[in-house]
Regions:
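C-terminal accessory/binding modules appended to enzymatic or scaffolding proteins
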Residues: 380-392, 398, 404, 562-610, ...
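Conserved phosphate/anionic-ligand binding catalytic regions in large, soluble enzymes, centered on
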Residues: 33-41, 84, 188-210, 253, ...
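Short amphipathic, charge-patterned alpha-helical segments
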Residues: 249-251, 401-416
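Flexible inter-domain linker/hinge segments
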Residues: 124-190, 345, 351-366
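Gly-rich Lys/Arg/Thr-decorated short loops/hinges at beta-loop-alpha junctions or inter-strand turns
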Residues: 32, 155-170, 223-235, 338-343, ...
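Accessory "access/gating" subregions that flank catalytic or transport cores
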Residues: 173-215, 371-372, 377, 385, ...
Length: 627
């Protein structure tokens, strides 16, 4: 049981104690225990490291509270970000990064690295024929500016002592004892911090609106951890890797706005994030950093976790508060806004995970420090989940204004298998697809809005030349239809109609006028829908129409999909000059559509062919083509 801190002086003393303990660790092994690396078996690597070090008599500590001289710190850290190369293990103080680690590598890591001080080349990262020993030298990391993610991968996410050792909760102490609430709001406003979960509303302005309700004795802070975009995992990694940072940001928001209760809304599909947040909240309560009379200041703040059922629409503010209240997650008409009447009808400050995680550093280091990177209208950094047909997938953080080209080619390592770049889908189902023409566009709120996309929560899906853009539009529209709450007719019926048209087109049944109808429906949905989900639902269709209308026309008029992705528009033929008559294709065909004699060219009956592609995939001579 941790002893409760009753004053600022006790807090500073405890913080200094853990800072000293951290500095005294001569060597550290940081085993990535984010969701991806855990799925890859890194927990087994961690347990084997602990077991073998104990057997070999190597002094090993897993907590700063059990510190002894000349020990090796063994930590279960959060996500390191380089998911493509996981499971990952980092060795300090050298900063060495080992990739694709397995239990079978543990003995060599202990003998050669921990005891021998040598780098194991076969576990190092290689790119372009060059071996990289230090994590910071790897191009994936070198081009980044990690602020929100600074300590993800460097501390034990389930230890409040580790968070205190890096200056954690220092911003809270400063906010409580050295600043007035209006000063906190002003610093956040001056920093230019904008919401990192969607449209980029100024955070300081929102806080000021909640703080202005001085007549209300009850106000709430709500953290939106309902990360629903396909392929996005920024908030999850932040909650898993540095949960105390999010909690501290929320408490500071409570001090600034006069709110005394907070809710973190996390989707139940994030069990590790829920667990680590729960542990962090209990630890903060034990130390007196949450609850009544925090640090003896007289300020009270209580925090709860609410697990959502995974509905995408619950990422919308009013739908989220309805869900927390126990009602069906459905958006409501605005005004009133949540800052006036939100959770339980009270003024509510609602920001997303990354927004709150930026707050502690802004309070400690100041608005000018935060604005030292980024663009004039979009200061600071932004975390992105880089996925798709790119060499290096993972979690990245770059200054606002970084170009797409830098992200895809310098950080991501370019397109897989040497193929040509085609598009990037940014902003999830509410975002849009950008092309080669947009590669040098600064990624900030205003520039992307002009290009017909949004930053959103930060999902980046890279697509190569083999991606069908009509299918991409259909995928996102199908997602929107499934996730629509059904409350308003434009979204419920309009998106269904758009999906019907897109499905027809991909099946080869497109008609003249479909493109015009898609645009007309999109405009109607944007102008008439009740909430942000509906208003932005047509974005993937509109952006693909704007940038790839020729593909739509090929599907509709030529009955052709240039990538071969739309099976209904694909015809398989056998090249008689290449076919050896081995009969493998005929034996593999589930529809019996292929005939021919042994050692003679075969033939595919297009009437029987179900276009599964099994023949082409199995042909050892490459004789089967897509026509």
């Amino acid at each position: 049981m941790r002893q409760r801190i009753e004053s600022q002086e006790q807090f500073r003393a405890l913080q200094a104690e853990y800072m000293a303990a951290r500095e005294a660790e001569k060597r550290k092994i940081l085993v990535c225990c984010g969701t991806g690396c855990v799925a890859g078996g890194n927990l087994n690597v961690y347990h084997e490291l602990k077991k073998r070090m104990d057997e070999l008599g190597v002094p090993c500590e897993v907590s700063l509270t059990e510190h002894h001289d000349d020990s090796v710190g063994l930590k279960k850290s959060g996500c390191h970000g380089f998911c493509e190369m996981g499971p990952l293990v980092r060795i300090e103080p050298e900063g060495w990064l080992y990739t694709k680690c397995q239990v079978s590598d543990v003995e060599e890591i202990i003998q050669k690295t921990i005891l021998g001080g040598q780098f194991i080349e076969r576990l190092g990262y290689k790119q372009g024929g060059e071996l990289y020993e230090r994590q910071e030298d790897i191009p994936f990391y070198k081009r980044q500016t990690r602020r929100v993610l600074e300590h993800c991968g460097h501390i034990d996410a389930e230890s409040i002592e580790e968070y205190l050792s890096i200056g954690g909760y220092g911003a809270l102490a400063k906010a409580l004892f050295e600043m007035q609430p209006d000063e906190i709001v002003q610093v956040v406003s001056d920093s230019g911090l904008r919401g990192r979960g969607g449209a980029g509303f100024p955070t300081g302005k929102k806080w000021a609106q909640v703080a202005a309700h001085t007549e209300e004795p009850v106000k709430y802070i709500v953290c939106n951890g309902d990360e629903g975009d396909p392929g996005a995992f920024m908030d999850r990694s932040c909650m898993e890797g540095d949960p105390h940072k999010v909690i501290e940001g929320m408490i500071v928001a409570g001090v600034a706005t006069g709110s005394t209760e907070g809710y973190i809304y996390v989707r139940a599909e994030y069990p590790m994030a829920v667990h680590r947040l729960t542990v962090a909240i209990e630890q903060a309560k034990e130390l007196g950093l949450l609850g009544d009379n925090i640090l003896g200041s007289g300020f009270n703040f209580h925090m709860h976790i609410n697990c959502g059922a995974g509905a995408f629409v619950c990422g919308e503010g009013s739908a989220m508060t309805a869900s927390i209240e126990g009602n069906r997650g459905m958006p409501r008409t605005k005004p009133p806004r949540s800052v006036d009447k939100g959770l339980y009808g009270k003024p509510t400050c609602l920001n997303n995970v990354e927004t709150f995680a930026n707050v502690p550093d802004i309070i400690k280091k100041g608005a000018d420090w935060f604005k030292s990177v980024g663009t004039e209208g979009s200061s600071g950094t932004k975390a992105f989940a880089l996925t798709g047909n790119v060499v290096n997938t993972g979690l990245i953080e770059v200054p606002m204004g970084t170009t797409m080209r830098e992200v895809v080619y310098e950080i991501g390592g370019g397109i897989k298998n040497g193929k040509a770049f085609k598009a990037v889908q940014i902003g999830g189902p509410s975002g849009g697809c950008l092309t080669e023409a947009h590669m040098d566009l600064p990624m900030d709120f205003d520039s992307l809005k002009k290009a017909g996309a949004i930053i959103g929560s930060g999902g980046l899906v890279v697509m190569d030349e083999d991606t069908c853009m009509v299918s991409i539009a259909q995928f996102f529209m199908n997602f929107i239809c499934n996730e629509s709450c059904g409350k308003c007719t434009p979204c419920r019926e309009g998106t269904t109609r758009m999906l019907d048209i897109l499905t027809r087109i991909t099946k080869g049944n497109g008609r003249p006028g479909d493109i015009e109808e898609l645009r007309s429906l999109a405009k109607m949905i944007q102008n008439s829908s009740l909430c942000g989900l509906g208003k932005t639902a047509p974005n993937p269709v509109l952006s693909t129409l704007a940038n790839f209308e020729d593909e739509y026309r090929e599907h509709i008029f030529d009955k052709k999909c240039r990538t071969g992705s739309c099976r209904s528009l694909t015809t398989y033929v056998i090249d008689p000059a290449v076919c050896k008559g081995c009969t493998k294709c005929a034996r593999n065909c589930p529809a019996g559509a292929i005939t021919g004699e042994l050692k003679k060219p075969h033939h595919i009956d297009p009437e029987k062919c179900i276009k599964c592609g099994a023949c082409k995939a199995g042909c050892p001579f490459g004789a089967i083509k897509e026509a």
